[in-house]
Amino acid sequence: MTAKTLIVLIGPTGVGKTELSLRIAEYFKTSIISSDSRQLYAELKIGTAAPTPEQLKRVPHYFVGTLQLTDYYSAAQYETEVMSVLEQLFQQHHVVLLTGGSMMYVDAICKGIDDIPTVDAETRELLLHKYDTEGLDNLCAELKLLDPEYYKIVDLKNPKRVIHALEICYMTGKTYTSFRTQQKKERPFHILKIGLTRDRAELYDRINRRVDQMMDEGLLEEARSVYAHRELNSLNTVGYKEIFKYLDGEWDLDFAIEKIKQNSRIYSRKQMTWFKRDEEIRWFHPEQEKEILSYLQASIK
């Protein structure tokens, strides 16, 4: 019997994961699990380059358009739900494909998330109220006092991370750091990681053209439709936050579009830095489809 294998197809934004993922899934007659933390939201289609209705017809997808913007969701929830879906899918397929560029979500499945206590609604509301009334800087100062170790490594510009760490400190009386064991979990399937990469100039050109295409497809209208929710963490996202600056009257539209391109390029560099630390990834150019399929076939057998 062939071992269960999860193919993990990763790479920076704009590299060309979508079409190749469809072709790999069709080749193995299997389903795709998205590991894009923004494609989860039904309202965010254009700005997240979510699979089109035609692409969704070609291959069954999971974790695309399943949430509303106001839904709270975490990488820990994602891990639990994906593991449950994988258990079902592996009863029908010996190979399943996971693809996307959200580094934390990929790691949640490949390595696992630490068992951190579930935050109660009262604590969550308290800290969200503090964030709204006192601002992020005050919360960062509080985190420095309660968990100086995590304060040194957390992205202090990311309110969701800062708030979550404080929630755990408030609720348990312990540091958030004390729950972060970062021990890799054993998985009941084999994991094969394929990384896609391009020459930087080639990737940047693709990113720039993709942003232009998103604008042609109606990104401005999509951003306008969710503008009322602009304070949500789910919309602190490249492509939306820049358009909001235009809608606020701070930037003109051409400048906002250039900032989307620039911030997308910066994000692609961050993704590559994260992925390059993983020695399990086998790297290919997206056009090396034949080589990728040969490698997968040999590795799965």
From Swiss-Prot:
Give one GO biological process term: tRNA modification
Query: Which residues bear the site annotation Interaction with substrate tRNA?
Result: 102, 124
Q: Which cofactor does it need?
A: Mg(2+)
EC top class, in one word? Answer: transferase
Q: Binding residues for substrate, per the UniProt record?
A: 13-18
Which GO molecular function annotations are given, in alphabetical order?
Answer: ATP binding; tRNA dimethylallyltransferase activity
Which InterPro entries does this UniProt record tie to the protein? Dimethylallyltransferase, IPT, P-loop_NTPase
Which keywords accompany this UniProt record?
A: ATP-binding, Magnesium, Nucleotide-binding, Transferase, tRNA processing
* Pfam families noted in UniProt: IPPT
Annotated positions binding ATP? 11-18
Q: What reaction is this protein's catalytic activity? A: adenosine(37) in tRNA + dimethylallyl diphosphate = N(6)-dimethylallyladenosine(37) in tRNA + diphosphate
In short, the EC number is: 2.5.1.75
Give positions of region: Interaction with substrate tRNA: 36-39
- Highest taxon of the lineage: Bacteria
Job description of the protein:
Catalyzes the transfer of a dimethylallyl group onto the adenine at position 37 in tRNAs that read codons beginning with uridine, leading to the formation of N6-(dimethylallyl)adenosine (i(6)A).
Q: Which family does it belong to?
A: Belongs to the IPP transferase family.
Q: How does it assemble?
A: Monomer.
Query: What is the protein named?
Result: tRNA dimethylallyltransferase 1
Origin organism of this chain?
Bacteroides fragilis (strain ATCC 25285 / DSM 2151 / CCUG 4856 / JCM 11019 / LMG 10263 / NCTC 9343 / Onslow / VPI 2553 / EN-2)
Source organism phylogeny: Bacteria, Pseudomonadati, Bacteroidota, Bacteroidia, Bacteroidales
